[in-house]
Amino acid sequence: GGCCSHPACQNNPDYC
């Protein structure tokens, strides 16, 4: 869940 479930965040793990 959370941001890590969004492709945009998967491409930017620093945001997870």
Swiss-Prot record:
Recall the GO molecular function terms of this protein's record: acetylcholine receptor inhibitor activity; ion channel regulator activity; toxin activity
Modification Sulfotyrosine occurs at: 15
Where Cysteine amide occurs, the residues are: 16
Instruction: Determine if Disulfide bond is one of this entry's keywords.
Output: yes
Q: State the GO CC annotations.
A: extracellular region; host cell postsynaptic membrane
Free-text tissue specificity from the UniProt record? Expressed by the venom duct.
What is the annotated localization of this protein? Answer: Secreted
**Using the chain's own numbering, where are the disulfide bonds?**
3-9, 4-16
Query: What UniProt keywords are attached to this protein's entry?
Result: Acetylcholine receptor inhibiting toxin, Amidation, Disulfide bond, Ion channel impairing toxin, Neurotoxin, Postsynaptic neurotoxin, Secreted, Sulfation, Toxin
What is recorded about the domains? The cysteine framework is I (CC-C-C). Alpha4/6 pattern.
The UniProt family comment states: Belongs to the conotoxin A superfamily.
Q: What this chain does, per the record?
A: Alpha-conotoxins act on postsynaptic membranes, they bind to the nicotinic acetylcholine receptors (nAChR) and thus inhibit them. This toxin is an antagonist of all rat neuronal alpha-3-beta-2/CHRNA3-CHRNB2, alpha-4-beta-2/CHRNA4-CHRNB2 and alpha-7/CHRNA7 nAChR subtypes.
UniProt-recorded name of the protein: Alpha-conotoxin TiIA
Q: What is the organism of origin for this protein?
A: Conus tinianus (Variable cone)
